[in-house]
Amino acid sequence: MENQKENLFSEPHKRGLMKSPLHPSSKANMVLAEIQPDLGPLTTPTKPKEVSQGEPWTPTANLKMLISAVSPEIRSRDQKRGLSDNRSALPEARDCLHEHLSGDEFEKSQPSRKEKSLGLLCHKFLARYPKYPNPAVNNDICLDEVAEELNVERRRIYDIVNVLESLHMVSRLAKNRYTWHGRHNLTKTLGTLKSVGEENKYAEQIMMIKRKEYEQEFDFIKSCGIEDHVIKSHTGQNGHSDMCFVELPGVEFRAASVNSRKDKSLRVMSQKFVMLFLVSTPQIVSLEIAAKILIGEDHVEDLDKSKYKTKIRRLYDIANVLSSLDLIKKVHVTEERGRKPAFKWTGPEISPNNSGSSPIMPLPASLEAEQSAKENCAKNLFSTRGKPSFTRHPSLIKLVKSIENDRRKISSAPSSPVKSNKAESSQNSPPVPNKMAQLAAICKMQLEEQSSEPRKKVKVNLARSGHYKPLAPLDPTVNTELELLTPSLIQPLGVVPLIPSPLSSAVPVILPQAPSGPSYAIYLQPAQAQMLTPPPGLSPTVCPTQPSNATGSKDPTDAPAEKTATDAATTGSLQPAPERHGAKHRSKETTGDRGTKRMITAEDSGPSSVKKPKEDLKALENVPTPTPLFPSGYLIPLTQCSSLGPDSVLSNTENSGTPSPNHRIYGSPIAGVIPVASSELTAVNFPPFHVTPLKLMVSPTSMAAVPVGNSPALNSGHPAPAQNPSSAIVNFTLQHLGLISPGVQMSASPGPGAGTVPVSPRVEADNLSSRQRRATNHDSPVLGQSQLNGQPVAGTGAQQPVPVTPKGSQLVAENFFRTPGGPTKPTSSPYTDFDGANKTSFGTLFVPQRKLEVSTEDIH
């Protein structure tokens, strides 16, 4: 039992869940009865009684409580001032009346709308003052006193005073104080308003609105927009789009609030409304037409339907005041769409001549155009008689605001011009090009002019000297010097054209400023060269010979097709003319399909070589060869200095040391192109302080004869070679200049040679009828030195072919080297690659369909 007591006491919230025993003892019931009164929270709470049934809790209950608490203090304060007797009794009486009476009874006890109407209020107001007051008596009006006497709000009195002020029946003295003038100036004012209305062409606007109403039916909003457009067109012509308040002479408004826009709106509208009655032929105006005309005072696009209705209500207020003055009366006009309320003019008949003096109003458009805006505002603001007061016209306020807005826009505008301004300026003015574009265009024009001048002068000199005629006999022992057309070699930068002797080309060379620097390679464009054709009876051949002192190893920097002579000359001249042209065309097509093109020049080896017979030279003399012209060229700097120039004009020495005459022939790989003797291609002696080492690199389709520069500055090389350029740079440069096709890749891997010694081919001493040769490869490299204008040049021995004229192997050589579609007597010229392996290129007509694999054993 004790445990049960503890459970019941400790967990009272579980009593409801506990089941009563089947046979509860009476003692347990007594214990529960004793515990029950002590457990107050366990009992069910009773519902609290409502404090106030008649006053429910509302969101403003606290506010009402505060007002009721503060109101005694307010009443005591009013009692101290002596005003609480009259004013406190009225709210108390109203409160008591409102408490005792219901809503309808309270409304009935208040003054009715008719009693509070503006017309009735205006009648009461006019009854207080005479129509024609005595000017000698004080006729001041205090609006506070009038509102208190008439028991109305002061704003209702303001509406009446504004309409009376528009007719100059009252004038404002100070705040809430006016002067009563009565009807003394009424006739004069009405005459003035009629003249102003005629100037504004209100009669025409009324007729136009009526005619459009008959033509089509539209609602208020659309008609507002259309009629505002008409009003703007008419008022824009007369300059009265925003007419100011029409004043009379002698009537002054000394307060600034008179000219404020907000207070002036009702007065100006009242004057315009009166004008409509005075100018209309049947002096009946409906409020709808009046609203359409008078609504042009404000911005019509900003007005919606509610504002339009507000204008109508304001017109009703004006009409009520004018009706109280017995100037108009309300009538109903019957139209097609029904009866409409309108007002008829019942005032005095006014003619424009009745006005004794001219009113002060906005000037006509002719005078307004002549005078400034400030003078116009001053005329509208001040009267001619009396002392002008310092009041601010609303137009001045607009002017100040516009100036402030402009200043704010200017100060906040970014420094950079706006895009729209740029577009407008670009349309009005011609576009200004960029400075870099101007410089590029100027440089391009100057280069074109400088490159075109040498061509013109070369053609003139060639025409004068008669180079297009058959050539004179060639002297193999005399080297004619190249002419320099312009003596501007001393200029730091310029294009110096090299005028050749009859069988060379004019190559413009750009001279750099620095006396020493990286070597340059001259590239000639292949498409502009003219080919030299031999006579049909002559078929010269070129066979490279092996030099003894100088070798033709390739420099890795000379990877992009360095050459001064061709592989060999073909016997295409024996073919007919169409076949020769076809061979030329095929050779041009197949040259771009190869991998890396290299043309090796063979140096004359000395007296061991076979000399050219005099018959061949004589036959060569009579060849009419037009001079090929290369109008443009490129200079590409190379990182490794070489001594290319002088060795093309060196007198080569053998072991015997006897100099050999400079009988060099620069051939072309195209069939039918005649070789040119090197005696006509001599060196140009450049000043050593102006020219850096040059590498002359000519494409095979344009190579006929190349002059080589010769200078002491070209002979000496750098003690240590510079870093070789990468193959990507070389390929990009050559492809950008258009010298190689995009598919051709030039290798720039370093090679064994430190310098390049071009080797010129020699004329093979053989008869024309028995031209037989066999190209053999010489495997043993020869190391030696050659004197280049007094400077020793070390050369790495390369494998050069040794010309052999076998007596009985003509058929084998012809069958071996014959190519399908090639020439009848093809020639071969091996060239040396960077790795030292020999490769053989056969003739100029390369057919990619057949690949010839030749081993050195077959050739030997």
UniProtKB/Swiss-Prot annotation:
One of its GO terms (biological process) is sprouting angiogenesis. GO terms for cellular component: cytosol; nucleolus; nucleoplasm; nucleus; transcription regulator complex. Residues 113-182, 261-347 bind DNA. Pfam families: E2F_TDP. Keywords: Activator, Cell cycle, DNA-binding, Nucleus, Phosphoprotein, Repressor, Transcription, Transcription regulation. Residues 1-27, 38-57, 407-433, 532-616, 745-803 are annotated as: Disordered. Residues 412-429, 542-554 have a biased composition (Polar residues). Disruption phenotype: No visible phenotype; mice develop normally and live to old age. E2f7 and E2f8 double knockout embryos die by 11.5 dpc of massive apoptosis and dilation of blood vessels and show increased expression of E2f1 and p53/Tp53, as well as many stress-related genes. The modification Phosphoserine is found at residues 71, 102, 412, 416. The keyword Lipoprotein does not apply. It is found in: Nucleus. SUPFAM superfamilies: Winged helix' DNA-binding domain (SSF46785). Residues 555-565 have a biased composition (Basic and acidic residues). Highly expressed in liver, skin, thymus and testis. Expressed in trophoblast giant cells throughout placenta development (at protein level). Interacts with HIF1A. Homodimer and heterodimer: mainly forms homodimers and, to a lesser extent, heterodimers with E2F8. Dimerization is important for DNA-binding. Atypical E2F transcription factor that participates in various processes such as angiogenesis and polyploidization of specialized cells. Mainly acts as a transcription repressor that binds DNA independently of DP proteins and specifically recognizes the E2 recognition site 5'-TTTC[CG]CGC-3'. Directly represses transcription of classical E2F transcription factors such as E2F1: component of a feedback loop in S phase by repressing the expression of E2F1, thereby preventing p53/TP53-dependent apoptosis. This is Transcription factor E2F8. It comes from Mus musculus.
